[in-house]
């Protein structure tokens, strides 16, 4: 390996469950045309799907969560984690073939995989056998009151090209960046998913918290860190409130 190749060494990643963020807008006009009984049948069918998907979580083979999105970008977000891309696709198809999907309009989606990089160092032994690492690669999505999702890239322009930095430079920058996130431990749960080759951005960031203001505080503080200020490129932000299965009838009531 040449000196230049060593300098620009690619970060190695540990990869966990595959992730789908599926954002939908309700076609309320069409939904209102249904009778109350018809709507109840559709809600029951969707509730059954959620229960079916929940069985995988009980067996440790995935996780899912549902949030009502605030603003006009979407009405709700379904986030799914599964061991394989095929299983992710199967769930996507199950929902698309459901009666409820007939009254939704796709608003946005994001395909990625839960990721940990070697920027923060690694311990001895097989990391996939480390309980702490496994908990991060194969997480059970929390029942937090609020969610925030956004995609992001590392900048590749002029002197601000992340991919032309040496491994040592990137590792030092990410260590400082990570310390900010650690300051929100217990307040915000963060799941980073890699999407290079899977979607239009390079990473997806999903934040969970019981205090919605923590999203604003965390993202704002990170804007002053060099990783974000100099090298970060961000897509649209989506924020929402947890939509428990028991709340579906009220959410869909018209």
Swiss-Prot record:
What are its E.C. numbers? 1.3.98.5
Instruction: Specify which residues bind Fe-coproporphyrin III according to the UniProt entry for this protein.
Output: 136, 150-154, 177, 190, 228
Q: In which pathway does it act?
A: Porphyrin-containing compound metabolism; protoheme biosynthesis
Record bears the keyword Iron: yes
The chemistry this enzyme catalyses reads: Fe-coproporphyrin III + 2 H2O2 + 2 H(+) = heme b + 2 CO2 + 4 H2O; Fe-coproporphyrin III + H2O2 + H(+) = harderoheme III + CO2 + 2 H2O; harderoheme III + H2O2 + H(+) = heme b + CO2 + 2 H2O
**Annotated family:** Belongs to the ChdC family. Type 1 subfamily.
The membrane-spanning stretches of this chain are: none
Which Gene3D superfamilies does its entry note?
Answer: Apc35880, domain 1
Q: Which GO terms describe its biological process?
A: heme B biosynthetic process
Protein name per its UniProtKB record: Coproheme decarboxylase
Q: Which UniProt keywords apply?
A: Heme, Heme biosynthesis, Iron, Metal-binding, Oxidoreductase
Recorded hits in InterPro entries, A to Z, give:
CHDC (IPR031332), ChdC/CLD (IPR010644), Dimeric_a/b-barrel (IPR011008)
**Cofactor comment text:** Fe-coproporphyrin III acts both as a substrate and a redox cofactor.
What's this protein's function? Answer: Involved in coproporphyrin-dependent heme b biosynthesis. Catalyzes the decarboxylation of Fe-coproporphyrin III (coproheme) to heme b (protoheme IX), the last step of the pathway. The reaction occurs in a stepwise manner with a three-propionate intermediate.
Superkingdom of the source?
Bacteria
Needed cofactors, names only, are: Fe-coproporphyrin III
Q: Name one GO molecular function term.
A: oxidoreductase activity, acting on the CH-CH group of donors, oxygen as acceptor
User: What is the species listed in this Swiss-Prot or TrEMBL entry?
Assistant: Bacillus licheniformis (strain ATCC 14580 / DSM 13 / JCM 2505 / CCUG 7422 / NBRC 12200 / NCIMB 9375 / NCTC 10341 / NRRL NRS-1264 / Gibson 46)
UniProt-annotated catalytic positions? 150
Q: Which gene encodes it?
A: chdC
